[in-house]
């Protein structure tokens, strides 16, 4: 899985990337205290990191690909310092409270976090890896952490992930505390391979802690 992910970034096969940021984040993100620590797993080079930091939060993304991490800072125009700790490379932005940790997410143990934003992590993982991801993620969060999860729903018989379709029953089994807050049709942001496969419905489901 890790090798495949790195290869996609090396080849520029990043059809899931939302260059303009995520609409659902801006519509549904809960208001938190300034300085709240927000965790963004498997963040890629998402501009959502910058948006969250601009709201006054301390944002930490975790990403396997160094190509993605360096691209984020270059595109955002933010200088950074680098530290290496425990096999992970910490890219610490010199503007805003914004850090991206480069390495294997399962080796990342910094905690606790006040909030979680997951748009591209759970849906990137095949079913057999999801429970381990969720267990590890929960270990990094405060017991009362606010959480926002975005899943995708589409006809997976026509095309497979990643990103994968994750159905509501599975979400509730993994995260009973999450409630579905709304849906957005995301045909404009649909990866090209799904459009080529003839998929006509592609929904982002937004889940929040109540």
Name each region found by the language model.
Residues 50, 119:
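Short alpha-helical basic/polar micro-motif
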Residues 1-35, 45-48, 61-98, 102-109, ...:
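Class I (Rossmann-like) S-adenosyl-L-methionine-dependent methyltransferase catalytic domain
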Residues 53-54:
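Gly/Ala-rich phosphate-binding loop of Rossmann-like dinucleotide-binding domains
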Residues 57:
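Conserved acetyl-CoA-binding loop of GNAT-fold acetyltransferases
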Residues 109-116:
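A short acidic, Gly/Pro-enriched loop at the edge of an enzyme's catalytic core
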Residues 39-46, 121:
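Class I SAM-dependent methyltransferase "Motif I" SAM/SAH-binding loop
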Residues 124-136:
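A short, conserved alpha-helix within the catalytic core of class I
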């Amino acid at each position: 899985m890790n090798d495949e992910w790195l290869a996609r970034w090396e080849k520029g096969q990043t059809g899931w990337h939302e260059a303009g940021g995520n609409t659902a984040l801006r519509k549904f993100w809960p208001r938190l205290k300034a300085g709240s620590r927000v965790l963004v797993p498997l963040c890629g080079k998402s501009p959502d990191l910058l948006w969250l930091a601009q709201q006054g939060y301390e944002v930490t993304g975790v990403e396997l690909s160094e190509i993605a991490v360096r691209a984020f800072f270059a595109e955002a125009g933010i200088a950074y310092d680098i530290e290496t700790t425990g096999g992970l490379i910490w890219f610490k932005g010199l503007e805003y409270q914004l850090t991206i940790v480069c390495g294997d997410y399962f080796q990342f143990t910094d905690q606790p976090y006040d909030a979680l934003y997951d748009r591209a992590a759970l849906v990137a993982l095949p079913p057999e890896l999801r429970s381990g991801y969720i267990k590890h993620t929960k270990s990094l969060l405060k017991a009362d952490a606010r959480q926002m999860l975005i899943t995708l729903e589409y006809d997976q018989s026509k095309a497979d992930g990643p990103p994968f379709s994750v159905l509501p029953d599975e979400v509730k089994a993994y995260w009973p505390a999450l409630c579905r807050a709304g849906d957005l049709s995301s045909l404009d942001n649909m990866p090209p391979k799904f459009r080529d496969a003839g998929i006509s419905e592609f929904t982002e489901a937004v889940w929040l802690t109540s």
